[in-house]
Amino acid sequence: MTNQRKFSIIKLALIILITAVFLISGTNSLQAGDYVDIVDRAGREIEVPLNPKRVVAVGPGALRHLMHFDLEEKIVGVEEGEKGDDLYSDYQLSNPRLRELPPVGPNHGGDIELIVAQEPDLIIHASDPGEAADLQSKTGIPVVYLNFGDLYDNRNQMFEDWELIGQIFEKEDRAEEMINYTEDLITDLSERTKNIVDNEKPKVYTGGMSHRGSHGITSVRVPFPPFRFVNANNVAEEELDFDSVTQTNIDREQLLQWNPEIIFIDSSNVHLIKEDVMRHAEYSGLDALQSGNVYTLLPYASYRPQTGNILANAYYIGKILYPEEFSDIEPVEKAEEITEFFLGKPVFEEQNEQYPSFQKVDLLN
């Protein structure tokens, strides 16, 4: 073989090798240290690290939604309200390591110095958009503001935030999976109940809804997503007409006038509701209390609405209101399935130990 031919073969081999290296690197071009341009919920264009390794999440719901993406190991500090041994939110129970992490300041935004001390690559902020921009300006750390919407009228907003989290952490498939799963459950609930005629639906009410603290029987959320999902006859919507899910407190006289046949109450506030009934004897005449049709739900909110609990509550409500349409559903099993999907671990039983749910409660004794 001539030297020229040997040289040609070597040259060709080098070209093939270089091309292969280029193709391989091209298929995995998003390496650690890469950045991606995103637009957050406040409309801010931000360059953020792709799949950051050190993350702080502050504000209502921020940490919860990151846990839906199995990002616990990336969290390097938590707000003070996320620490302690008396926490029973679904994501806290499924990720006990969180309470052992260093504090980054109070709830609703944390403290700048404590956040910076944890050297995060990225901050997820869900409190105030102005505070998010200010935090980025003062720290030089990318801060992404998200809002997370809710499961009813602002569901698409929550889905878009999931998609953004998926983009940042290279978990687009997980975001799509969560969106599809959520929509499938809501569709299933609606399909089971859409043909039930109004005169066959009992009058229902839900009370004891927490909002920036615990509240008694007159605290409601309207529209109440679980009721809407199962097309329930919610007496509160006879008088309260809100476009978005809104927490409000009604007058005692209003509840007495509505006189619901069935009442669902937030299990985290049963003690307050019992106090209400003891303090105001007129409540004892309500049809729901007289017939024993008062049932407990998983806590609706704890530092923002609890996605899995809301969906699980809807199935339990459906089972109580329309047993034939939900004959194949065992509510506790469904709740465990839902929490395991969102958090990787079924936590109903652990929540239930603290806040007994999916059961009748006697408010008269």
Named regions from a protein language model:
Residues 57-117, 122, 232-235, 243:
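A short, structured surface patch at a secondary-structure boundary
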Residues 13-25:
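Bacterial N-terminal signal peptides
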Residues 104-107, 112-125, 251-268:
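Proline-aspartate-enriched helix->loop->beta-strand connector
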Residues 24-33:
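Sec-dependent signal peptide cleavage junction
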Residues 219-246:
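Alpha-helical, coiled-coil/dimerization segments enriched in small aliphatic residues
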Residues 35, 45, 134-213, 296-364:
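Extracytoplasmic substrate-binding proteins
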